Amino acid sequence: SRGLGDVYKRQQEGYPYAMFRVGLYLEKAVLGEAKPEEAFAWYTKAAMADENEGIFALGRCYKQGIGTEEDWDKALEWFGKGAEKNESRCLTELGLAYENGNGVEENPQKAVEYMTRAAEQDYGYAQFKMGDYYFFGCGPCLEDNKKAVEWYEKAVANEIPMAMLRMGDYYLYDYDSLNESEKAFAYFKKAAEYEWYNEGLGICYEMGIGVEDNETEAFKYYTLAADNGNVTSMYRTGLCYYNGVGVKQNYAEAYRWFTDAAGNENIGAAYYLGKMQMYGEGCTPDPEAAVQWLLKAAEKNNDKAQFELGNAYLTGNGVEENDDIAMEWFEKAAENGNEKALKITGRRRK
């Protein structure tokens, strides 16, 4: 195309930005097939000519192993050169490196310093990270929901979907007792426009929070989020199939989703997986395997799993029958408010 010819002409004339663009075209397969090694060579030329885009791209290549061997030392060297020029993405990369200990020793203080510099330049992702630093606490950023929200809102204004989800969670789970959960829906819906999902939008539709309740829509958004790897949504998708919420009841599908979620450490899913294996719901009964999943959930204080373990020891299903151990689990379940366990322990005490 004429535009591409202009880029080549300019790189031949020594325009550093054009060198970067040629590298980008080669990396992203604009010219046909991707040619990462050639892209790396052009990024190097642009970076050596002190072009900001080239500097960042070269650092990214060394970080991700694009067209060259992964090399954190060289990646940080180039990100450092960009940071000296106050390049926001390079500052952000240095912040992430110090946050996670990639190529350097973990240093929360430096992570915050670099991320603050990037965020103050109105760089959206850095603003999101600053929100996280204040929300979860990082180095000099003590937990401070007010400051976290200020940064998240700036990131939302810069169209960062992750910040939209954080703000949705902030209102949905009412971290500061504002009783404004209806505001969550708008943030979750906005994130969905960018195809970013967590369990929040499904919960809003299922519970009628900020929108009229709609189980079909709830199931739709749970599955979208689950397909994107959100573990809580995998669990909730399993619940929908198990209970017939927004979809026809299907134990086999419920079992599949609970398996995925439990494999990712979701405690509720571990309970349901154990329960289904115990009674053969959507699968072949396997009491021994069931006990292992129930134990995993029970040890995290899931009262239903504790009650089921009590039953298992009481009847010798999947374990050797033992009334004393059964009562221990019933007692633990009762302490966690399980009504069935309370009845059993109450009768025993009389």
Regions found by a protein language model. Give the residues of each.
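Canonical positions in the second alpha-helix
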Residues: 9-10, 45-46, 81-82, 117-118, ...
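Short helix-capping/linker turns of helical repeat alpha-solenoids
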Residues: 12-16, 28-30, 48-52, 64-66, ...
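Leucine-rich solenoid repeat scaffolds
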Residues: 324-350
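Short, small-residue-biased leader/transition segments that mark boundaries at the very start
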Residues: 1-8
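Hydrophobic face of amphipathic alpha-helices that form TPR/SEL1-like repeat modules
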Residues: 21-28, 55-64, 93-100, 129-137, ...
